[in-house]
Amino acid sequence: MGTIADDILDDLHGRILKTLDQLRTELAAVRTGRASLHLLDNVRVDYYGTPTPLNQVATLSVPEARLIVVKPWEKSMIPPIEKAIRDGNLGLNPMSDKDLVRVPIPALTEERRKEIVKQVKHKGEEHKIAVRNVRREAKELIEVAEKDGDISGDDAEKALEKMQKETDDGVKKIDEIVAAKEKDVLQV
């Protein structure tokens, strides 16, 4: 196959992997009823007037299955950390305890678990669409290269077959990631 087709396929592969990584990152922040440091990934603390990621002003740990402990590097950061976690729309109620903040993770109701599963499936669908859009763009590039005479018809056909397999594998992997997260959310 021509190098143009190889370059297009390499780009497709890289963009699909990036989409899978993005899905994993987004789903890591979804609450499952068990403590996970990723729950607080999007929490920003007012650090001397600058919104700063929580993990840049404190040490985070999970000593128990339903508890996150936040140990700020400066004691003065305890109230802003509590406020940031409370305001983070995570349904969490942090409590200060001398020089640290305890964040108990409440159990999820069955109804809430089902809502979360819907969100997880929706995120999976969004990422499947992204993978298909990447395939469509790559297909258009292959067709243009064939029309311009940069690659032969046979090479274009082989590239399109590889592209479809790559896309199918990406969609299958998204289904696996979503199924694993669903199982995690529904587990009591």
From Swiss-Prot:
InterPro entries: Ribosome_recyc_fac, Ribosome_recyc_fac_dom, RRF_sf. Its main location: cytoplasm. SUPFAM superfamilies: Ribosome recycling factor, RRF. It comes from Anaeromyxobacter dehalogenans (strain 2CP-1 / ATCC BAA-258). Disulfide bonds: none annotated. This is Ribosome-recycling factor. HAMAP family: RRF. Responsible for the release of ribosomes from messenger RNA at the termination of protein biosynthesis. May increase the efficiency of translation by recycling ribosomes from one round of translation to another. It is found in: Cytoplasm. Keywords: Cytoplasm, Protein biosynthesis. One of its GO terms (biological process) is cytoplasmic translational termination. Belongs to the RRF family. One of its GO terms (molecular function) is ribosomal large subunit binding. One of its GO terms (cellular component) is cytosol. Gene3D superfamilies: 3.30.1360.40, Ribosome-recycling factor (1.10.132.20).
